[in-house]
């Protein structure tokens, strides 16, 4: 089991005060399991309120099982505007494969709560599990479209050094121990689809999600309701980065995926 050292609430608050003095307006909390420790999260956001830190915050990698109306209300008061959830898949068997310890109903409830409370809600999905098929992809894309999300990202699966997926692939001889990041690719017997095919499927998912008139209308209403066209600006930025950015992503990844031993 991996060990980690968390920062104290006091330490984070002090850094935020420094950033505010330096003129920063927006801060993103980058944490692979943000809100996992609810007690610490409550102390952090209450501390932000008590210290009168007037900034906007983006919370990344929010856990579905950490979704709580009281906690979300406190986060809203503290200045959190965006919540990003790692949802991974619209298929229960794939969620189980990734050991997500959640289900589709809990995911839907978490996204509904986030949307209800007015957060700009982002969901990320991973495509390319070893046994994932076209039907799985279609189900995930349709599941994403059925949720009240303000933004999505469909990304190809990557095997990262030290992860269970990576360790298993190394033991099976599919990945060298010197390769620190490897993307799913049937050319290497990592799944049923080539990396290029996965990128194409991700692009398809983005087009289907963002090109819906109902989605565009909903975001316009949300921008007006919040009297904050930052929502709309976020959409425009995310729209172009997701629709067109993945083509650049393809060229970038091929240059950076492997470690030169």
State the predicted function of each range.
Residues 3, 27, 55, 151, ...:
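Secondary-structure transition/capping residues
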Residues 38-39, 93, 97, 127-135, ...:
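Flexible glycine/acidic-rich beta-alpha junction loops that bind and position SAM and/or redox cofactors
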Residues 1-122, 127-129, 136, 142:
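Radical SAM [4Fe-4S] cluster-binding motif and immediate context
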Residues 22, 63-72, 94-104, 125-130, ...:
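Hydrophobic transmembrane alpha-helix bundles
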Residues 164-261:
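Radical SAM enzyme core and accessory elements
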Residues 116, 142, 146, 204-207:
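Charged/polar positions on well-ordered alpha helices
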């Amino acid at each position: 089991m991996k060990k980690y050292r968390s920062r104290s609430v006091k330490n984070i608050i002090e850094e935020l005060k420094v950033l505010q003095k330096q003129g920063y307006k927006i801060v993103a909390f980058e944490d692979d399991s943000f809100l996992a420790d609810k007690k610490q999260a409550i102390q952090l956001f209450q501390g932000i309120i008590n210290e009168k830190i007037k900034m906007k915050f983006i919370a990344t990698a929010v856990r579905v099982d950490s979704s709580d109306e009281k906690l979300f209300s406190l986060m809203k008061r503290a200045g959190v505007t965006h919540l990003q959830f790692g949802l991974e898949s619209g298929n229960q068997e794939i969620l189980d494969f990734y050991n997500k310890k959640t289900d589709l109903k809990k995911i839907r409830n978490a996204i509904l709560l986030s949307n209800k409370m007015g957060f700009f809600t982002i969901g990320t999905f991973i495509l390319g599990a070893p046994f994932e098929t076209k039907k799985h992809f279609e189900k995930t894309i349709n599941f994403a479209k059925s949720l009240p999300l303000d933004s999505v990202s469909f990304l190809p699966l990557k095997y990262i050094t030290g992860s269970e997926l990576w360790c298993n692939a190394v033991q099976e001889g599919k990945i060298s121990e010197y390769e620190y990041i490897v993307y799913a690719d049937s050319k290497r017997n990592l799944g049923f689809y080539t990396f290029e095919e996965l990128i194409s499927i991700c692009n398809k998912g983005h087009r289907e999600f963002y090109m819906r008139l109902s989605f565009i209308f909903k975001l316009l209403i949300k921008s007006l309701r919040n009297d904050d066209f930052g929502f709309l600006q976020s959409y425009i930025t995310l729209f172009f980065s997701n629709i067109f950015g993945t083509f650049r992503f393809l060229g970038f990844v091929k240059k950076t995926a492997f470690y030169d031993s």
